[in-house]
């Protein structure tokens, strides 16, 4: 490890010791941050996998039910049923700070004003069968789970990026900056000891 190109003086020695103290403290803080990010990241990955598996099953089952319900209806009637949507959804995103990582928080709100006027669904109960009503209701209920999945996946991506950045900073301090400072401090201490011994020898020669 190449030492720093500085003059071997007591002032430089003091400055380097302060830098080493700061680097050591920063290294510990960054390691703690990395470890906590990793812990939360693992929890989110587990939630992401479980949520994705659950959603894939529920969406597939719901789509199958919808296809079966649609098969018992006239195709033209089905098109008319969904021709004029009345279910409006407002989506907004807040930002949450997790260990200095800004991650999205999705919120959804249904605008039910028109639904209350025209009924819960975008069609008349009299015009459709109960199976189709159930599948549409389940689809609406799955929306929040889909948003949560998107939120978790984006959070995992952002946290993974920050974990990698933090890991590089920790390694830079641990394997480069701190050893370089320690070696330079050791070098200056040796030089100062040599200078002190040489000065002592000169004094002894003068007094003798």
From Swiss-Prot:
This is V-type ATP synthase subunit D. HAMAP family: ATP_synth_D_arch (MF_00271). Belongs to the V-ATPase D subunit family. Produces ATP from ADP in the presence of a proton gradient across the membrane. One of its GO terms (molecular function) is ATP binding. Pfam families: ATP-synt_D (PF01813). It comes from the Bacteria. It comes from Streptococcus pyogenes serotype M6 (strain ATCC BAA-946 / MGAS10394). Keywords: ATP synthesis, Hydrogen ion transport, Ion transport, Transport. GO terms for biological process: proton motive force-driven plasma membrane ATP synthesis.
